[in-house]
Each structure stands twice: as C-alpha cells, then as structure tokens.
Amino acid sequence: MDPNTVSSFQDILMRMSKMQLGSSSEDLNGVITLFESLKLYRDSLGEAVVRMGDLHSLQNRNGKWREQLGQKFEEIRWLIEEVRHRLKITENSFEQITFMQALQLLFEVEQEIRTFSFQLI
C-alpha cells in the first residue's frame, strides 16, 4: 500500500471536516462518510492481496466480493461527480485546492482498486 495515498486520505478527510465546520460550507457528511468507507475498503483489498495464500476463502466469497467491488466503483463514480460539482460551485481557494486533491486521490484509488482486484481474480 502506498503510504502517500494513506496520508492523502487523512489530509483530505481532515480538510473536509474543517470545511464542514466553516459557516460558508455546505453539509459534507455524505462525502466524508463515503471517503472514509472507500479508504477502509482500499486498505482491506490491499491486505487481501498481501495475504494471497488465503485464496480459498476468497473464492468462496467471490460472488459477494464481486458485488461489493461493483458497488465501490459506483461509489467512486458518485464521489468523482460530487467533488467535481463542488469544485465548480466553490469560490473559496482552500476548498478548491481540497476538492482538486480529492479528485486526484479518487482517480488514483480507483486505479489502485482495479489493480488489486485484477490480482485477486
């Protein structure tokens, strides 16, 4: 797992939490919750790749695993659209930087999850 991605997640979540506390920002609960969920999922997928000796149990759960994977890709697409939308409507430079970094992170994580999933299939 890339330590830069982990610190990027933590940094962006911290920034979004600060933005949420700001009087001018809209409610970011859904975005923050999905970001946290995505981080946990990415981390667990990475751990599964590291423990590839556990393939038998993974194959037993394969149907459910594929369904979860599809759901995560839908969540990533929703997050990308939501972050793009917020980037377009915000005029605050701190928020713009945060959303641009969040967008970049989402693209990186989407690629990482694709790579992990191909290794597990």
UniProtKB/Swiss-Prot annotation:
One of its GO terms (biological process) is exit of virus from host cell nucleus through nuclear pore. GO terms for cellular component: host cell nucleus; virion component. Pfam families: Flu_NS2. The keyword Manganese does not apply. Changing residue 34 to Q: In strain: A/Fort Monmouth/1/1947-MA. Keywords: Host nucleus, Host-virus interaction, Transport, Virion. It is found in: Virion; Host nucleus. InterPro entries: Flu_NS2. Gene3D superfamilies: 1.10.287.230. Transmembrane segments: none annotated. A motif (Nuclear export signal) lies at residues 12-21, 85-94. Mediates the nuclear export of encapsidated genomic RNAs (ribonucleoproteins, RNPs). Acts as an adapter between viral RNPs complexes and the nuclear export machinery of the cell. Possesses no intrinsic RNA-binding activity, but includes a C-terminal M1-binding domain. This domain is believed to allow recognition of RNPs bound to the protein M1. HAMAP family: INFV_NEP. Belongs to the influenza viruses NEP family. Interacts with protein M1. May interact with host nucleoporin RAB/HRB and exportin XPO1/CRM1. Average number present in a viral particle is estimated to be 130-200 molecules. This is Nuclear export protein. It comes from Influenza A virus (strain A/Fort Monmouth/1/1947 H1N1). The lineage of its organism: Viruses, Riboviria, Orthornavirae, Negarnaviricota, Polyploviricotina.
